[in-house]
Structures are given as C-alpha cells and as structure tokens.
A protein has these predicted regions:
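Hydrophobic Val/Ile/Leu positions in short beta-strands of Rossmann-like dinucleotide-binding domains
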Residues: 5-6, 31
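Aromatic pocket-lining residues of Rossmann-like dinucleotide-binding sites
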Residues: 20
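Conserved N-terminal Rossmann-fold NAD(P) cofactor-binding segment
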Residues: 32-69, 84, 301-307
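Rossmann-like NAD(P)-binding element
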Residues: 51-114
Length: 310
C-alpha cells in the first residue's frame, strides 16, 4: 500500500509517518508539506532508520506523487489565533482544506483511493471531503473520536491500575465538546466497568473530563498532540491495508445509523479494504442516545454556518 500524508512535516503528520514506519505494513510513504524542506527532512530522517525496521520506500513529494496513492491522509491545519472565535478558526481551516482538496483533484487520484481526514474540525471537513471528491461511499473517513477513545481507555487504565489493552470503552459523536462517552458497554477484562474494583461515578466522570480536555492539555504542555494521534492514524490505515474489519469510532457521513443522516460524526464502524464498510448500532442507554443525537444536531448547526459562509 502507498500512503501519502499531506501536512507530513508537522508534528501530527510526522508522528503518523513514523507510526506507519514502525508498523512495517505499508510499502510506501510520501510526505507532502507546504514547507518542502521540512517534508524532505522528515522523510530522510525516517528513511535513515529503515534498515532497522522494514523495507519501505519513504520520500518527500508533491500532490502529483499522490496520484497513484492507495490512501491519502490529510493532517494539515491552522492554529487558533489569540482571541479568535471557534467559528472563525473553523472557517479559516475550511478555506485551507478546500484548497487541499482542489490540489488533490487537479493532480488526480485513484478512483478507489481512500482519504483519511485528520485536520480539524474533523467531522465538518470529512463531510466536505466526501462532497468534493466524489469517491465511492465509505472511501472518505475521518479520525473522529478514535483518539478520544484511546485517551479515555488509557486514563481509565491509569486511574484504576488496570492493563490498558484490557480496557474496552468507546466515545462516539463529535470530536469536540459534544462527544459522548458510552458507559453502558464499558468494561475491563470482560468485567463491566461499574463493577471493577475502585471504580466510582466520580472517578469515571473525572476520567472522561480529562480525556475530553486532553487536546488542550497537550497544547499547553507540548504545543500539541503527536505520538498518540500518530498511533490512532496508523490504527485506521493498518485496518484498511490488512482488510482487518476492525470496529473503530471513525467519522463518516451518516445514512441512518441511530437515525442520523447528512452529518459526519463517529459511530462504531467496520474498517477494512474498502474504507468505512459498515456502521454498527451497539445498544445504548436512552441518555446516551439522546446525547448522540444532540451531538449530531450541534454538528449540523456548525455545518450550516460553514456552508452559509461559502
């Protein structure tokens, strides 16, 4: 599989590239960035380590080098300015994102390529990418709440002194303020979370709050997330490359799952060779269902504002 990473010079894109290199599953990685020297430096740095990992082709390039890519990962984005409103930042990122999509279309892409959107606001941009690129259904997906889910699991493991790989919990909805933790199916080692030694409602809520605000915490402490988002991106790409049919909370334009339509957000999704292949409706508590639908409404309102702004 050939993977192109747009914005691959930055911390998110470079972390994704390195995670893909360590995975040793994809055959070729192309780093594309507006800063060509930075892209070249990141590609060289990874290539230098290739003899110790896997026989992969790792290069820097332009949009023309993505014309035969099996998957294009978009990580480029703008940071918030001081005193800038959330909507103003969203609109600036939408302008940048549309220019990226236009560059992809101009250079050409495989008719069955998959596109993974990581740039924020990921749900809004995933919707726009599907509308603009004209790819088959399921070929455009966003990272969604996968990173939030991994953060949630890792923090539950930390607070309960449990093995992180045995924590099963998922966050659905918007990658943003209206995200929804699904307590009803959360478990550790097969034991319902509420019955796990040491778990309390307060511990659970505090853990979710920290997971929800981890993005801001990362910005404050180290300018932004890198390693964990890179691992999240690799998890999606590896599921596509291996056709592993993993169920992941990625963002796609909904067509009836949980009664949601014409909005991109995260629900349990089977990810395989064809991208987002199927959405699943796990049973939710009524209050979780209400929160998920509210999250959809929040996103539809924001999308309406973005579309109105042109």
């Amino acid at each position: 599989m050939k993977v192109g990473i747009i914005g691959g010079g930055g911390i998110v894109g470079a972390s994704a590239g390195f995670a893909l290199q360590l995975g040793g599953i994809v055959h070729e990685i192309v780093i594309v960035d507006v800063n060509a020297d930075l892209a070249d430096g990141q590609a060289l740095d990874m290539m230098h380590g290739a003899p110790a990992i896997a026989d992969q082709v790792i290069t820097a390039g332009g949009y023309e080098d993505l014309a035969d890519a099996d998957l294009i990962c978009i990580t480029a984005g703008l940071r918030r300015k001081p005193d800038e409103s959330r909507l103003a930042l969203i609109n600036r990122n939408v302008v940048l994102f549309k220019s990226i999509l236009e560059s992809i279309k101009t250079a050409g892409h495989k008719p069955d390529a998959s596109v993974l959107v990581v740039s924020n606001p990921v749900d809004i941009l995933t919707y726009l990418a599907e509308q603009e690129l004209g790819l088959p259904q399921g070929r455009v997906l966003g990272l969604g709440t996968l990173l939030d889910t991994l953060r949630f699991r890792s923090l539950l493991a930390l607070n309960l002194k449990a093995p992180a790989t045995q924590v099963s919990a998922i966050i659905l909805g918007e990658h943003g303020d209206s995200m929804v933790p699904i307590w009803s199916s959360a478990s550790i080692g097969g034991l319902p979370l509420e019955k796990y030694p040491g778990f309390t409602q307060k511990l659970g809520q505090d853990t979710f709050t920290r997971a929800k605000t981890s993005g801001a915490e990362m910005i404050k402490k180290k300018t932004g997330a890198g390693f964990a988002v890179g691992v999240s991106i690799a998890e999606v790409i590896h599921a596509i490359a291996l056709d592993s049919k993993r169920v992941l909370p990625v963002s796609t334009v909904q067509r009836g799952c949980y009664g949601l339509r014409d909005v991109a957000l995260s629900v349990p999704t089977v990810v395989g060779r064809s991208g987002a292949e199927q959405t699943l409706e796990i049973e939710l508590w009524p209050k979780e269902m209400q929160s998920l639908k509210r999250s959809g409404s929040v996103l539809q309102e924001t999308l309406g504002q973005v579309l109105a702004a042109g």
